[in-house]
Amino acid sequence: MANSLLEGVFAEVKEPCSLPMLSVDMENKENGSVGVKNSMENGRPPDPADWAVMDVVNYFRTVGFEEQASAFQEQEIDGKSLLLMTRNDVLTGLQLKLGPALKIYEYHVKPLQTKHLKNNSS
């Protein structure tokens, strides 16, 4: 009985969402910010190392973390900083609730770091 109950619970767990594909829009960006928008252009997201603070904020707003995105702005996290963040930085340094912080790190920060390393190691 307990096993079937657990199986039912775990059957409801969804896989993490995939990262949206992004493109760069440099027009009308007087503050030096790289515009981030959903797109399949280039077949991959632009290098997050080039993102300004507002690009990081807009990325997290776009992927559904509207409330938490402001923490990246308050802490002045640009793309280079984002790529250097550890799990502990996200869980404690941004002063976010644990649930969203875990999702932000596991489903977004870590994959962005992995893609950046993969794209820049070859």
UniProtKB/Swiss-Prot annotation:
PROSITE patterns given in the database record: SAM_DOMAIN
Span of domain SAM: 51-119
Domain of life of the organism encoding this protein: Eukaryota
Gene3D superfamilies attached to this UniProt entry: Transcription Factor, Ets-1
InterPro entries linked to this entry: PcG_chromatin_remod_factors, SAM, SAM/pointed_sf
Pfam entry (one): SAM_1
Coiled coil start-end: none
Matching CDD domains: SAM_Atherin-like
Stored PANTHER family: ATHERIN-RELATED, POLYCOMB GROUP PROTEIN
Protein name, entry field: Sterile alpha motif domain-containing protein 13
Native species: Homo sapiens
